Amino acid sequence: AQALNLTQSAVSQKIKRLEQSVGGPVMVRTKPLRATPLGKELLAHIQKVSVLEEALNIQSGLEASAAPISIAVNNDVLATWYSQVMAAFSDKRANPIHIVNADQTQTRDILQQGRVMACISQTGTPVTGGQSIRLGTMRYQLYASPRFIERYLHKEISPQSVMSTPGLLYDEYDVTLLTDYQRECLNIAPSFTTCHWYPSSHGFVKMALDGVVWALLPTLQVEQEVNEGDLVPLFPQKELGVPLFWHWTTLESAALADLTKAVKNIAKAQLK
């Protein structure tokens, strides 16, 4: 209300009229306010229209404000190389990037729902009305600190002995990644009974460094820690590769095209 120089009552009336117009509630009236699924779709639609209006104004020689671009990106990419994408894009464009944080198995669905304009996913098939390109492969290994190895694995390091010690999962979606590693790399049945859940990318690495757990981590994220001997790959020859794809909605937007170019260039340098 303050931003629009309106009374709270006037804002409430505008929201009610909007909800009547679109045929459903657009927000959950809690503190803080949350958008409903319909509200999220409406917001994404407004952002897409803003991006198109920006492109049209530029083509017409009119002054154009930089419209936000909403995307969905997973934790491991955010923790490793996506900040470089932001830097490269910001050198050319002033468009704010609004990032929805979601697992790489979920980001494509978010794009399909219309909540974002682009995403990074482990699935390559484009969404309806969109395009996709392969970026490369994110590689994962199982790591632990020398302290952890001395405490729990001083007798032997085997798949069975490791899985009987404290491990780490980020959240419920991380189960899929660890399951793939256990089956494809270690040739064992999935087991999570000794795993803590700790949904923090920085904290994930810290827990492993502190000798609390073993952790399945992107090799990109812990190169320095491995080189300095603070983390040790438990099975150096066992590496899980996760393919990553960039998806985007087909829009006539130079800003989105520049973001796509930045993603491709940085991914080419970072991913194998």
What are these regions (language model features)?
Residues 163-188:
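Secondary-structure junction motif
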Residues 5-10, 14:
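Helix-turn-helix DNA-binding motif, specifically the short coil turn and the N-cap/start of the second
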Residues 17-37:
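A short LG(V/I)-centered, amphipathic sequence patch enriched
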Residues 188-233, 239:
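Hydrophobic hinge/microswitch elements
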Residues 66-128:
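Central regulatory/effector-binding core of bacterial HTH transcription factors
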Residues 234-272:
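A late-sequence structural motif
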Residues 21-22, 42-63, 263:
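Alpha-helical linker/hinge and terminal dimerization helices associated
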Residues 132-168:
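Flexible hinge/capping segments at coil-to-helix
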